[in-house]
Amino acid sequence: SFLVVHTVYVGLVRPNAEAVLEAERQAIAAQQESGETVTIERSAWVVLKDYDQEACFILMFWVMAIMGLKAQAVGAQLNLLNQSLVKIEEGRRVLPEDARKLARPLEALPQPERGFLLPRALRAALNRYGSTASVADVSSVVRDLCDTEADRLDSELSMVRYITWAIPSIGFIGTVRGIGTALGNAHEAVAGNISAVTASLGVAFNSTFVALLISIVIMFLTHQITLMQERMVMETQDYCDYNL
């Protein structure tokens, strides 16, 4: 993501931003000579041009790649719920000695399906039933395994949450940097040249603006991937309860 975003910034964003700023400087110079008022429109290139915004976009695409891989993995596990992994005829009573035979198709699954939550939960349930012949123990082992998987999936989102926190923080760093630069150029504003001060204030507000917009998008995607993971765990538990 770093190479792609940096290439776009070097080849597209910053050259266009410099062209827009040069046009603005010429318009202001013409305004001072003629005394006419010139309206300067806000440009997206100028809003995006600084290094703070570039860092935010790099983090955004990085975290989106992480969530994309997680969404793909969860989707594969949800698709597995539509298959009949344990074939038990309706009305048939399953005996403890049948558990080993029923678990063989689960052990024959290819990777990575064999490591998915549903096959692991079914294997654990059948193994527990084969050793204890207790339905209560079967329900307990499925529930414990699903709870452990939910905790693991939640902990794996810690990097996503950290990046979601870091993006607006980078925006605020840009704000502090821009305001500090503006204060350093305050003597020029006193002399009548406010262009340096306004440019620095633009850096300050643009960085926060872009960072907050990106943060809103990332928070929404994080919420969606969390819902997908919770749904997968709950449907796996329901699948085991219904089919066993």
Model-derived features: positions:
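Juxtamembrane "helix exit" motif at the C-terminal ends of alpha-helical transmembrane segments
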Residues: 2-19, 69-70, 170-190
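Membrane-spanning helices that line or support transport/gating and their immediate boundary helices
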Residues: 15, 67-78, 182-185, 216, ...
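Peri-membrane helix termini and adjoining interfacial loops of integral membrane proteins
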Residues: 28-36, 180-195
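Membrane-interface, cytosolic juxtamembrane amphipathic helix immediately N-terminal to a transmembrane helix
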Residues: 39-41, 45, 133-167, 191-199, ...
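Alpha-helical transmembrane segments of integral membrane proteins
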Residues: 49-59, 161-167, 202
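Bilayer-spanning, highly hydrophobic alpha-helical transmembrane segments
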Residues: 159-183, 205-221
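Channel- or pocket-lining gating/hinge segments that regulate access to a cavity or pore
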Residues: 192-244
